[in-house]
Amino acid sequence: MTTPQEVLKLIQDQKIQMIDLKFIDTPGTWQHLTVYYNQIDESSFTDGVPFDGSSIRGWKGIEESDMTMVLDPNTAWIDPFMKEPTLSIICSIKEPRTGEWYNRCPRVIAQKAIDYLVSTGLGDTAFFGPEAEFFIFDDARFDQTANSGYYYVDSVEGRWNSGKDEGPNLAYKPRFKEGYFPVAPTDTFQDMRTEMLLTMAACGVPIEKQHHEVATGGQCELGFRFGKLIEAADWLMTYKYVIKNVAKKYGRTVTFMPKPIFGDNGSGMHCHQSIWKDGKPLFGGDKYAGLSDMALYYIGGILKHAPALLGITNPTTNSYKRLVPGYEAPVNLAYSQGNRSASVRIPLSGTNPKAKRLEFRCPDATSNPYLAFAAMLCAGIDGIKNKIHPGEPLDRNIYELSPEELAKVPSTPGSLELALEALENDHAFLTESGVFTEDFIQNWIEYKLVNEVKQLQLRPHPYEFYLYYDC
């Protein structure tokens, strides 16, 4: 734990000039306000720094927009991308009128999820380990006007460039679904990924590995260690910030969109998770795959509430272009040991109880990690409290099941609209505990429907011209 006094000493010792205060909006984008170093004192870590919240997506109107950012001293790191010495600090949001934590602040909701876990007596720590995939592109252009709509992405690694005159074209472009794990020269991003990883470490993220991913066109992944729920979400936001800015330094652009390329694998964010109490792991036992009853019930909660969960963990229309058969995506709601075709996988981790965990493979990195982790924890707790058994495991390759067998396995919603409908009909597991408020859930659903689902419904799609122009 870092104290406010230690942060203030760091500012003095490192001759920090600016303090960059970062917080997350409802959809999941980091926002920031930068202040001169002398504007921060010990009260900033309790009372906060005032700002106007009227323009923050999903928050307040202009008539009640005053809010305060409360600095978390445990999140301070020197920003490697700023010209002047700048200290970055992540904040949570308070209501200045009441001094209460703001119930639409995602980081506040994440803390309430931990408090809820403790209050149940089931555990005191929830560990999460997200694995967020992304694409590195050389060019990304898109536009939508009254009479046109298009997108165009390109990558030096794109298989579609095999016949392009690149003066000269040196080939070695990964075939579709064959980007995992060829060495250089097929893998052109080794040095960039290493710089990303080391920069993350300098920002306080406990790094592990980096590698190319399955898809052509520059799909990659960096790995960092699992952490407690809030710190894991903090690290994920730092991960995305570092990756995007290092790529920009190389003249490249990064997207965490689940499906930016047609015909190849999409990008997910598999989430490893477990519950501990008094420093001891609780998911190891003598049941299937070496799990405890608690772990199985947790899985039962995840699977029962999965359609509703996806309204939060897969919160974009693009999310459901990834969740389709044929691209190694977890479209079937089942669990299995080591089987990556199941939506919940129990990694093969030997007999060490500390390594026993589950991996929910549906989420993607368009999600707000604080909300996604909190929602998954609530679903798991509901499973434990109500002893929801997940049924029999599915240890066969789901992709090879016959249509008759597959029809018996529940599947993920086919669209964001259907996932939001499931969330509308099944969110008591989120609200009865007080972790999420009814106000938040209804605001979330309305925001997603009005600003995303309905906006796409209004606009012609380029492929519709291919299908229907000559009608």
Curated annotation (Swiss-Prot):
Residues at which Mg(2+) 1 binds: 131, 270, 359
Keyword Magnesium on entry: yes
Binding sites annotated in the UniProt record for L-glutamate: 265-266, 322, 328, 340, 361
Keywords: ATP-binding, Cytoplasm, Ligase, Magnesium, Metal-binding, Nucleotide-binding, Phosphoprotein
InterPro entries per the UniProt record, alphabetical: Gln_synt_N, Gln_synt_N_sf, Gln_synth/guanido_kin_cat_dom, Gln_synth_cat_dom, Gln_synth_gly_rich_site, Gln_synth_I, Gln_synth_I_adenylation_site, Gln_synth_N_conserv_site
Reactions mediated catalytically: L-glutamate + NH4(+) + ATP = L-glutamine + ADP + phosphate + H(+)
Disulfide feature: none
Class in the EC hierarchy, top level: ligase
PROSITE patterns, sorted: GLNA_1, GLNA_ADENYLATION, GLNA_ATP, GS_BETA_GRASP, GS_CATALYTIC
A Pfam short name: Gln-synt_C
EC number assigned by the record: 6.3.1.2
GO molecular function, one term: metal ion binding
Activity regulation statement: The activity of this enzyme could be controlled by adenylation under conditions of abundant glutamine.
Name of the protein this chain belongs to: Glutamine synthetase
Organism annotation: Microchaete diplosiphon
Species classification: Bacteria, Bacillati, Cyanobacteriota, Cyanophyceae, Nostocales
